[in-house]
C-alpha cells in the first residue's frame, strides 16, 4: 500500500527558531538559584546532562537533576521561565527569512502546520505570539499542554488528534534535535526530517529515527512535495 500524501507538518521550534544558546543560558541561571553555580563540579555535571538531553522539556531535565525534591524543581522551573522571557525580550526570538519562506510555501501547498516547543507556555508565550504573527500555524503545542514532552510521541500524536489526521503516515515531523526526531519516530509519522546545517550530527539523527536529514530548511517544501 502506498504511503498517503503529507497533510500535516509538526515543526519543532527548538534550535530552528528558538536559539539553543538562549535556552542553555536560562537553564544555567535557573540551577544557579538552587546553588549550582559556575566553577563547581555540580555545575559541570548539570550542564553536561542538559546538553545530552537537548530538545527535552527543561522541566523534565530539572526533575532528573533534583529528583524527588519537588520544591527545588518548581523553584528552578519558575526561574527558568523568568530567565528565558527576559532573554527573549532583550535579544528577540524570530524566525529567519528562510524559515518563514519555507513554512509559507508549506502552507501555500495546503499542508497544515503545527508548531511544537519543549518549553512551557509560561516560558514561550511571548515568543510564540511573535512567531505566529508571521507563521500561519493551525495549532501550537507547548510541553505543558501534552501528557509527556519529547522524546515521547505525545506532542506529535496530540497534534494528529487535534487536527484530525486520518493516518499517522500523513504527518511529517521536522526537528533539529535528536529527542524531537525520536518523538516523531515513535509516533509513526510518515516522514521524520532532521535539520543539521553543520552536517556533523547526521549519524545521531539517523539513529534517532530521521528518514532524511536536510542541511538547509529551504529544501523542506520541495521534499514534502516530492513525498506527496
Which stretches of residues belong to each language-model region?
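Asp-based, Mg2+/Mn2+-dependent phosphohydrolase catalytic module
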Residues: 1-8, 104, 120-228
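N-terminal helical cap/lid subdomain that shapes the substrate entry/recognition surface
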Residues: 3-97
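Short, acidic loop-to-helix structural element flanking the phosphoryl-transfer center
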Residues: 4-5, 86-115, 121, 125
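Active-site phosphate/pyrophosphate-handling residues
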Residues: 22, 60, 101, 122, ...
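A broad detector of the eukaryotic-type serine/threonine protein kinase catalytic domain
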Residues: 67, 85, 89, 111, ...
Amino acid at each position: 500500500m502506498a504511503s498517503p500524501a503529507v497533510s500535516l507538518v509538526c515543526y519543532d521550534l527548538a534550535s530552528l527558531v528558538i536559539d539553543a544558546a538562549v535556552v542553555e543560558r536560562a537553564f544555567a541561571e535557573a540551577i544557579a538559584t538552587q546553588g549550582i553555580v559556575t566553577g563547581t563540579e555540580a555545575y559541570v555535571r548539570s550542564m553536561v546532562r542538559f546538553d545530552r538531553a537537548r530538545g527535552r522539556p527543561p522541566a523534565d531535565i530539572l526533575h532528573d537533576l533534583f529528583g524527588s525534591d519537588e520544591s527545588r524543581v518548581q523553584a528552578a522551573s519558575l526561574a527558568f521561565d523568568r530567565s528565558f522571557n527576559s532573554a527573549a525580550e532583550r535579544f528577540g526570538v524570530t524566525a529567519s527569512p528562510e524559515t518563514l519562506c519555507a513554512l509559507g510555501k508549506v502552507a501555500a501547498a495546503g499542508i497544515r502546520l503545527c508548531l511544537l516547543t519543549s518549553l512551557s507556555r509560561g516560558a514561550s508565550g511571548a515568543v510564540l505570539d511573535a512567531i505566529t504573527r508571521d507563521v500561519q500555524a493551525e495549532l501550537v503545542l507547548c510541553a505543558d499542554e501534552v501528557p509527556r514532552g519529547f522524546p515521547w510521541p505525545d506532542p506529535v500524536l496530540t497534534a494528529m488528534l487535534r487536527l484530525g489526521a486520518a493516518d499517522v503516515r500523513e504527518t511529517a515531523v521536522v526537528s533539529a534535535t535528536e529527542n524531537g526526531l525520536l518523538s516523531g519516530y515513535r509516533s509513526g509519522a510518515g516522514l521524520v526530517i532532521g535539520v543539521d546545517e553543520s552536517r556533523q550530527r547526521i549519524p545521531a539523527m539517523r539513529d534517532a529515527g530521521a528518514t532524511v536529514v536536510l542541511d538547509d530548511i529551504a529544501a523542506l517544501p520541495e521534499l514534502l512535495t516530492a513525498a506527496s
